[in-house]
Amino acid sequence: MDQYEVLEQIGKGAFGSALLVRHKLEKKKYVLKKIRLARQTDRTRRSAHQEMQLIATVRNPFIVEYKDSWVEKGCYVCIVIGYCEGGDMAEAIKRANGTYFSEEKLCKWLVQLLMALDYLHANHILHRDVKCSNIFIARDQSIRLGDFGLAKILTSDDLASSVVGTPSYMCPELLADIPYGTKSDIWSLGCCIYEMTALRPAFKAFDMQALINKITKSIVSPLPTKYSGAFRGLIKSMLRKSPEHRPSAAQLLKHPQLQPYVLQVQLKSSPTRNILPIHQSLTDKVKKMTFPSDVVDSARRRMARRNSLGNERTVTFSKPSPERNSVSSTRSIKEYTTTQSVKGLSVDSSEAGDEVTSKAIITKTSSILRTPKSLPAKTYTARNQLEPPKTSYNRTYRSELPSKTTPNKIARPARRASLPLSTYETPTKRSISILEQLDSPDVSVNAPRIDRIAEFPLASSEDPLLPIHNKLSPGHGSCSTPPFINRSITKDKCTIQVLRTDGDNGSDSSGRNATAASSRGSNDSRQQRFDTSSFQQRAEALEGLLEFSAQLLQQERYEELGILLKPFGPEKASPRETAIWLTKSFKETAS
């Protein structure tokens, strides 16, 4: 604190204050955010420290600049961030006094905000409080996204469930107690752009119930006709009720309406700054220049590298397809990730899922038989190498977390047919104990304005939002499942949990729970999910594994047998659950 001179207080909230300070040596102005720890709950104090750690790791030209942070006398968490002379967007809307912003300026601002969100989402970070008062304007009229007090880090396919944020910017799925993902930030950004365009809030009511009704029905007034139809349609697409129908940040950056402004932002940004990739349709000549020339035979090299290195993840680039045109930055190859369009599968599309999962299980079994000595290395692979990529948005360049996707389409071996599957696959082998390492901690930072964690009943829904990573409660025989998840997952997970906790007596109750859950689906969807031929293939794969184990036992090759059966021990949850599920599926088919 001795390095800074306090100039004035520029803001005050429920948990602290914001001070305008000047660095004594640099003579540059910054904002000092002081979060009070005294007389606060343990969660508030923990969240303040988590916010300090999170904002220190974020680096993007369109996110507020991080300068320094410390804990002052155990009473305050102090965070020093860049100062934006233009104030926040809420103040700018008031200063406009009814004068509309130009469409060009709004498009530039939207592109910058989308790049900031795309960077966060690519690093599995939900902002959860995108609103006009958290959007700041720099001296050069560029945008900075700030205030990570409610941000949350997601692990793998995990979803958030805490009802936090500002009510008028909350998405319908959040208000409906449905777990939400990155599309919730897209909704909030849509509300902001609507407010910046119409100079009035997208959703406004006299009481909370009326506000919730408007949001859940997505009732908004028409935008001013001053703006083009394409721009107005772009804003409306961000405010679609179903999160599956909402575009991701990466998809919005590809919108023809934003392409000219995306290129402008790319050219103005310094090449050394960590910005996101710009999706731009260019000539084949330019596209060839942006990729290494030594990757002509990239597919063959990937296969050789995968067989030789096991679980080590290496990103290799190939020439982009027409639907994945992009301009890459000049960073090192290790920081690259592949930008690709992902088509989500609905819950009922289980035929493709059955086929892909069957091939995955067979491939996994055969790889174990070929290279049993590589199993211990897989078991102790680092966590950051095991996180499967999200399928709700296109991959983007990022520096904080390594990428795990390539354009090739190969089956993901750790997925079951009942889970929503992506239309691509990763070229690396996954650890057998992946489910154990993907528990997502509650990293919600700062005490929320509205905070309650709901338990979600089993119910049917039209569309899935994201692939779900379910957590099992160690003390209960049934699990809480989002309404739109495939019910075959619920049946499987609950049965496994009861076998662990209650032994034989729990199998009856789990069967009843599974029957109740599965009976809610239609007969057609049930027949489609439980495909007889698919379960037969899984059973044959398991039978082949058992036969090979018996052969090793007869030949007294105990060391290799131990390596082969090690993943199925009591400490290895994922393969054990898989084996139980396969056996149960085969018994149901036979009966």
Curated annotation (Swiss-Prot):
It holds the Pfam family Pkinase. InterPro entries: Kinase-like_dom_sf, NEK_Ser/Thr_kinase, Prot_kinase_dom, Protein_kinase_ATP_BS, Ser/Thr_kinase_AS. Its EC number is 2.7.11.1. Coiled coil: none annotated. ATP binds at residues 10-18, 33. Keywords: ATP-binding, Kinase, Nucleotide-binding, Serine/threonine-protein kinase, Transferase. The keyword Nucleotide-binding applies. Residues 309-331, 382-408, 500-534 are annotated as: Disordered. May be involved in plant development processes. This is Serine/threonine-protein kinase Nek2. It comes from Oryza sativa subsp. japonica.
